[in-house]
Regions:
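Short beta-strand-centered segments that line the small-molecule binding cleft or hinge
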Residues: 1-34, 119-121
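Hydrophobic residues within well-ordered alpha-helices
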Residues: 4-6, 55, 93-99, 134
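A ligand-binding cleft/hinge motif common to bilobed small-molecule-binding domains
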Residues: 14-22, 71-75, 89-121, 125-126
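Short beta-strand-to-loop elements that line the ligand-binding cleft
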Residues: 16, 62-63, 79-90
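Flexible hinge/capping segments at coil-to-helix
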Residues: 22, 26-34, 38-60, 145
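Residues embedded in well-ordered beta-strands
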Residues: 35-37, 43, 101, 119, ...
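Secondary-structure junction motif
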Residues: 56-81, 144-145
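A late-sequence structural motif
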Residues: 119-157
Length: 157
């Protein structure tokens, strides 16, 4: 993404880490926090928060296109079995019609809403939280001033 920004393929990019460069402007854009989605009958569904280790060993649904989040299940839940779905339609059908746990995030819940008969529980491990950064060329910063002001206000609240 950074190379594309420098080649002018992109005007802005969002990254999961800050960038320091004389040519680039970088500011905090927002955060995302992973959640476990559990059916009400699950033994841990009453928890206020869970660690990845609490769910290690479970069979869970997992969507394949989760980007950098993919390392968490493979590194932190080695005893779990993941039923990996490549098609979003298949994944959506399974999460609506099965009792298997799956990962979600606060951003996904805000954008797509909650699913009936599901309880969303925050994951307490630090790696289940990410800060995103807005990056553009310094010379383009004025072009995005309205958007940057909106980001600033959002982060202040």
């Amino acid at each position: 993404l950074l190379q594309g920004l420098m080649r002018n393929d992109y005007q802005i990019i969002i990254l999961p880490e800050p960038v320091e460069s004389e040519e680039l402007y970088c500011t905090r854009w927002g955060e995302e926090h992973l959640l476990f989605s559990l059916p009400p009958a699950h033994p841990l569904s009453g928890s206020k928060g869970l660690h990845l280790s609490d769910m290690d060993g479970e069979t869970m649904l997992l969507f394949s296109q989760i980007g950098f989040w993919k390392r968490i299940p493979s590194e932190k839940m080695k005893s779990s079995h993941f039923l990996v779905q490549k098609e979003s339609y298949d994944f959506e059908e399974l999460i609506r019609h099965s009792a298997l746990p799956y990962f979600s995030s606060d951003l996904a819940v805000r954008q797509q809403g909650t699913i009936p008969n599901r309880i969303f529980i925050p994951i307490l491990d630090p790696e289940a939280n990410i800060t995103y950064y807005f990056v553009t060329k310094k010379q383009s910063r004025n072009r995005f001033s309205a958007l940057l002001e909106r980001i600033r206000k959002q982060n202040a609240s």
